[in-house]
Amino acid sequence: IELNGKDISDEDFAMTITAVKVAADSIVQKGVCEQPTQFEILTAAAFLYFHLQKVDYAVIEVGLGGLWDSTNIITPVVSVITNVSLDHTDRCGATVARIAMQKAGIIKEKVPVVTAAEGEEALGPIVTMAMFKEAPVYLYGKAFYGTEVTSSMDGQKFTLHAGDYYHSDY
């Protein structure tokens, strides 16, 4: 969990994890749900921390797939699907198309989708879900692209080109 590029303090991490764990144990004891996974606890702690810090925006990365991921409870300003490849095949499916369907599960009603997915097998399910949800789709290489300026262990800098919009030094 980070805020403005800095890791959450040990004290804040302990406080948010403890608060979420106490709440989770309470609802499990009442039979409302099963014991949450470690990732679900961490996700809830991140949401709590961002709420307490009153952040304007948060970048939330899905843990696995998208459709059934614990991060999928939010309605984002924009949904980003970076690429689609054969990873997590034991849970997301054995083909690029099935994995793309899982990833497309993050698409929300009328929320823009930005993707760098390539090929019909990957793009098909994403574009289909976006059409169903009336969500505009912006494809990397068509609607926008980036040009790398520098890359190091400290991060990357690139120039973003998006239609008439141009900005440097991200």
What does each model-found stretch correspond to?
Residues 1-74, 90-92, 120:
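ATP-dependent carboxylate-amine ligase catalytic core
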